[in-house]
From Swiss-Prot:
GO molecular-function term, one example from the UniProt record: 4 iron, 4 sulfur cluster binding
Keyword 4Fe-4S: yes
Co-factor: note: Binds 2 [4Fe-4S] clusters. Cluster 2 is most probably the spectroscopically characterized electron acceptor FA and cluster 1 is most probably FB.
UniProt binding sites for [4Fe-4S] cluster 1: C11, C14, C17, C58
Cofactor: [4Fe-4S] cluster
EC numbers on record: 1.97.1.12
Major place of residence: plastid
Protein name listed in UniProt: Photosystem I iron-sulfur center
Sorted UniProt keywords: 4Fe-4S, Chloroplast, Electron transport, Iron, Iron-sulfur, Membrane, Metal-binding, Oxidoreductase, Photosynthesis, Photosystem I, Plastid, Repeat, Thylakoid, Transport
């Protein structure tokens, strides 16, 4: 069951989410949109275990990184019955 990991442009490039991830789903990539000149990226979402530690570690009030668990995604799309 794959989970969806979304990174939003409110990311400040602090690397807290990357360091919190126990399965190395996240990594930092160059980005000119913030002072740190980097943003989190989720190239390995198939390894996400859905622990949401990245969300908890995010210091922004906007939750720049969100994990949508497989069953939450299904429910929000109206596919659950």
């Amino acid at each position: 069951m794959a989970h969806s990991v979304k990174i939003y442009d409110t990311c400040i490039g602090c690397t807290q989410c990357v360091r919190a991830c126990p399965t190395d789903v996240l990594e930092m990539i160059p980005w000119e949109g913030c002072k740190a000149k980097q943003i989190a990226s989720a190239p390995r979402t198939e390894d996400c275990v859905g622990c949401k530690r990245c969300e908890s570690a995010c210091p922004t009030d906007f939750l720049s990184v969100r994990v949508y668990l497989w069953h939450e995604t299904t429910r929000s799309m109206g596919l659950a019955y």
